[in-house]
Amino acid sequence: MSKVYDWFEERLEIQAIADDITSKYVPPHVNIFYCLGGITLTCFLVQVATGFAMTFYYRPTVTEAFSSVQYIMTEANFGWLIRSVHRWSASMMVLMMILHVFRVYLTGGFKKPRELTWVTGVVLAVLTASFGVTGYSLPWDQIGYWAVKIVTGVPEAIPIIGSPLVELLRGSASVGQSTLTRFYSLHTFVLPLLTAVFMLMHFPMIRKQGISGPL
C-alpha cells in the first residue's frame, strides 16, 4: 500500500497539498457565523445529488410533469424522501445564502482587496434565487403555473423591450410547453453550470485572500 502511495506522491505531491489545506491560518475572531457559506455549498451539493436522482423519473412536459412528480412521491423507491430532501435543502440553501450575505456585509468582507469575491458572491446569490424561481414551476401544478405566469410577465412593464423579453422567457406568447422546457433546461443545466463556474472563482479567492478581519 505504501508503494502505491509513494507512486502518487512522487507525481502529485499529495502531502504538500494536504499540508496546505490543513495548515491554513484561521483568525481567532472566526465563529460559527463564518460557516454559513460552507453550509450553503453543502446544500447545493445535496441539491445536485437529489435533483440528479429525480431526473430519472421526471418528465418535462405539460401533460406528464405533474403525474411524474406524483409517481416520484408515491411509487418510486425512496422518491418521497429524495424530493423532500431536495425541497428542504433548497429552502435551507436560500436561508443560509441570505444570512451569509448579511454576515459578509456586516463584517466588511466586501472591502478592498475582496471586491471581486463580493461580486462573485452576489452573482451566486442571484443564481440561487433563480434556482428557486425555475424549480418552483417544474411540478406544473396550479401554484407552479401561475407563479411562472406572474414572474415571466414582470418584464412586460419595461418600455420597448418588455414584450420581446417576455416572449423570450416563455418561448411563445403564452405560458406553455416551451416555457416548461426553458425552465427545466435552466434549472437542471444552465444554472448548475454557471453556479459551479462562479464557485470555482469564489472559493480560490477566499483561499488566497483569507478571511476578513473583525470590524
From Swiss-Prot:
TM spans (from-to): 32-52, 90-110, 116-136, 186-206
Location in the cell: Plastid, Chloroplast thylakoid membrane
Highest taxon listed in the record's lineage: Eukaryota
Gene Ontology CC, one term: chloroplast thylakoid membrane
Keywords: Chloroplast, Electron transport, Heme, Iron, Membrane, Metal-binding, Photosynthesis, Plastid, Thylakoid, Transmembrane, Transmembrane helix, Transport
Residues binding heme b 2: H86, H187
Cofactor note: Binds 2 heme b groups non-covalently with two histidine residues as axial ligands. Binds one heme group covalently by a single cysteine link with no axial amino acid ligand. This heme was named heme ci.
Membrane topology: Multi-pass membrane protein
Chief location category: plastid
Binding site for heme b 1: H100, H202
Family: Belongs to the cytochrome b family. PetB subfamily.
Assembly and interaction partners: The 4 large subunits of the cytochrome b6-f complex are cytochrome b6, subunit IV (17 kDa polypeptide, PetD), cytochrome f and the Rieske protein, while the 4 small subunits are PetG, PetL, PetM and PetN. The complex functions as a dimer.
Protein name: Cytochrome b6
Source organism per UniProt: Phalaenopsis aphrodite subsp. formosana
Lineage of source species: Eukaryota, Viridiplantae, Streptophyta, Embryophyta, Tracheophyta
